C-alpha cells in the first residue's frame, strides 16, 4: 500500500498544481484530487496537502514537494 497524498482542487488552482503533477508521477504514491478537504482557512492562505491524513505545507510548490518527501521519510509506514 502506498502513502496517500490528497489535494484540494482550490489549492491546486492556487499553485499546488505543479506539486500535484510531480507527485502524481511517482508510482510509490497515491495522489488524489478532491473538490474540498474542508481546510478552507488553510487552503486560502498556503499550499498544502494531506499526507496519510496529516497536513503538510509549503510556501511554493517545490517546497511543498520537498516537505512531503521529508514527512514520508520521517514517518514511514
Curated annotation (Swiss-Prot):
Domain of life assignment: Bacteria
Name of a matching Pfam family: DUF1450
Disulfides per UniProt: none
Family, similarity comment: Belongs to the UPF0349 family.
Protein name as it appears in the record: UPF0349 protein lmo2392
Amino acid at each position: 500500500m502506498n502513502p496517500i497524498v490528497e489535494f484540494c482542487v482550490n489549492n491546486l488552482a492556487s499553485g499546488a498544481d505543479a506539486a500535484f503533477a510531480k507527485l502524481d508521477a511517482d508510482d510509490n504514491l497515491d495522489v488524489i484530487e478532491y473538490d474540498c478537504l474542508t481546510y478552507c482557512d488553510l487552503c486560502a492562505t498556503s499550499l498544502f496537502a494531506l499526507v496519510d491524513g496529516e497536513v503538510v505545507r509549503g510556501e511554493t510548490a517545490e517546497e511543498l514537494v520537498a516537505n512531503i518527501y521529508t514527512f514520508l521519510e520521517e514517518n514511514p509506514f
